[in-house]
Amino acid sequence: MKKFGKALLALLVLLLLAAALFLYWPLTQRSVPAASNDKPVDVVLVGAGIMSITLATYLQELQPDWNIQVYERLDGVAGESSDGWNNAGTGHSAFAELNYTPELPDGSIETKRAVGIAESFEVSRQFWSHQVKEGRLSQPSDFINPTPHMSFVWGDDNIAYLHKRQQALVKNPLFYGMQYSEDPAQIKQWAPLLMEGRDPKQKVAATWMPLGTDVNFGVITRQLTAGLQRSPNFSLHLNHEVSALRQNADKSWNVTVKDLKAGTESTTHARFVFIGAGGAALKLLQMSGIPESKDYAGFPVGGQFLAFQGQDVTSRHGVKAYGMAETGSPPMSVPHLDARKLDGKPVVLFGPFALYSTKFLKHGSWWDLYSSVNHNNVGPMLEVGKDNLDLVQYLMGQARLNDADRQAELVKYFPTAKPGDWKLVTAGQRVQIIKRDPLKGPVLQFGTEIVTDKDHTLAALLGASPGASTSPPIMLDLMAKAFPDQMKAGWEARLREIVPSYGRKLNDSAALVNEIRTLTSQTLHLPYLEVPVDANAASPAAAAVPAAAKEKRNANEELQAL
């Protein structure tokens, strides 16, 4: 018995030593090649998704003499979450996403986050509009299309909530035009597939916003990249993975990259580094060793959708219809029947169904999560896990789903759907932020966050939703934090040409909303509603499409222009 006790104690000691070695193992202990360039390049961008390419586009306009190098591990740009098939949701403008407008204990509706997201999306529209005018983006219908946004609920409590939500939001000029109905016939006119085959005794309600859009961020990323490549000061390196990041005494950076085809490594000397590598950003931030990286960990969650490509479905559903997450489910589980344009063709997606994976990227490694754990973040990760058991239970339940279970969820929103009509597709990975908050302690944070070092030489973007839809304003925030001197020295004036509302708030000015939306609607060929300057104006007039929009429209687009 004593021998067994000693053996058990020895095993425990070995496990503790192994755990300590694992948690304290240095991230950058190996030797790397010396930098091949004496004069540092101005900017290195890690990852060639919508975030990095948006930042590169800004910088090329603001500082065309800067040398910009982009390193991407895949063989093309926008291969991860920026790709249309991998993006969990597009055109996020808070018109329909109910998780952005929680009901407070006093029964009122919190609209602050929804208004902020709607404001941010207007900035995105201005940025894309400018790029169309400059010729960097081509025909608007290639990447953005009018697609009404709907919220759809059932049950007395949910119906009461949705009505209060609509009443709260339409007071803001950004949400003017949002309609509410409990009439099954009206809802069927908006979205036939939601209502056909539904129990006529079931009470339902919906909101309908004609100004919604669908956006293909893969197309935007590829077209902006092609525009960047026209400059001799821009270089894109595909099949190159960053393997080391080290700061020099002068605060510049040595970025070591591996050529995945040749198997060789090289090092680039850079003044500034942006880590825009999606889910991989956390590990690269940790690799940098900056003190700010110690406050973060990540929790990966994948997603799957049911995809409909048959014309009998896609021709009859031209809206994005968002529901309400089941009680106890996390915000990422909000179901939606979503009209998209992918590979130039209409598609309808239903989901998401969560997919647990330890990968930080769709094309990543199963070791990603474990290799991101260290002595700085293991405590917060365990505490967040303890406080979010509902999320753990939800993911376990999702892992047990079969096709029959998915079909059962689908018919709640598409009652006449047949199992043979859809195929299961896997979307991209998202890594939710686990953050050490100075006031709240460790928290699981939904959304995106910019992390910069105190010297303004490195920045990283962590997190997910609303993500790509607000990439232009997110990159504006990043530049304000990372390049404060340049912003004051002239960038801000130039930015007002790219984003006319820069430095001003749209959400408290109907006149400014009208001015900006007129501009972007004409360029992007999107519906437009005149917001009455009188706050007590009557019901909205019909949404109009500017005369500049001469493209052929399908029946749904014609209807929403009325």
UniProtKB/Swiss-Prot annotation:
InterPro entries with a match to the protein in the record: FAD/NAD-bd_sf, MQO
UniProt pathway annotation: Carbohydrate metabolism; tricarboxylic acid cycle; oxaloacetate from (S)-malate (quinone route): step 1/1
SUPFAM superfamilies in the record: FAD/NAD(P)-binding domain (SSF51905)
Pfam family, one: Mqo
Swiss-Prot/TrEMBL cofactor(s): FAD
Domain of life: Bacteria
Coiled coil start-end: none
Presence of keyword Oxidoreductase: yes
GO biological process terms, semicolon-separated: tricarboxylic acid cycle
HAMAP family: MQO
Family: Belongs to the MQO family.
Protein name: Probable malate:quinone oxidoreductase
Record lineage: Bacteria, Pseudomonadati, Pseudomonadota, Gammaproteobacteria, Lysobacterales
Designated gene of the protein: mqo
